[in-house]
């Protein structure tokens, strides 16, 4: 229990450090000398849409990784562990399906957003690479939880991402990069932390990727499909709930109002920091207890 408390406090510290950096980012974003309100609203709306695409693409693989990791770890040699490979295959299938749907729906998006949020229409296709980067990180993050990497992932997604954003904001303010280049780098922020996390797991010999179907997958096939189907619906509702407000504002009013709403949401999210740190630390313990 003491280890849980210590790790939770460390994760919470990194989360609040990230919020401090995020506050600096928001200040710079909202300074009209450097960014317009519409440009700030674009970054928030683009992130919300990318999160929505990621949530729908994941098809519940994060819950699969949480629940079944002990079964794979206890019954398979590392080189035969196909859990991460299976999760990546399911997520890739979901992402291809969602990207296709997004392409088909582009005329609808243009019709809904072109009048009040033309910037979002201009950068519409940036949703795809950003959503894919977020998806990759979330899959690897869920996998890494089982190795006790909750503190590390809290640092990466709460602190390092915001520091990376701060760096590219400064580059934009200094005139080193254009706004378009800024947006291109902005879409890759989760790719950066995915690479860092993958490198750390690889260096510690914990990054096992096999695409050959194992006996554990065959044995639990029906249960795996059931948990993927159920959690896909839960994740869809959760992501839609968190994204719909700012997207409706961008569609019906403008990106400026979406930016104001995003700022209020950012302030409210500060209260969730302890909860997020507890979740990151306790997931592997609950997974092991569920199996045993």
Positions of PLM-derived features:
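Alpha-helical transmembrane segments of multi-pass membrane proteins
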Residues: 52-53, 100, 115-140, 226
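Helix-loop junctions and terminal segments of transmembrane helices
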Residues: 59-74, 146, 264, 268-292
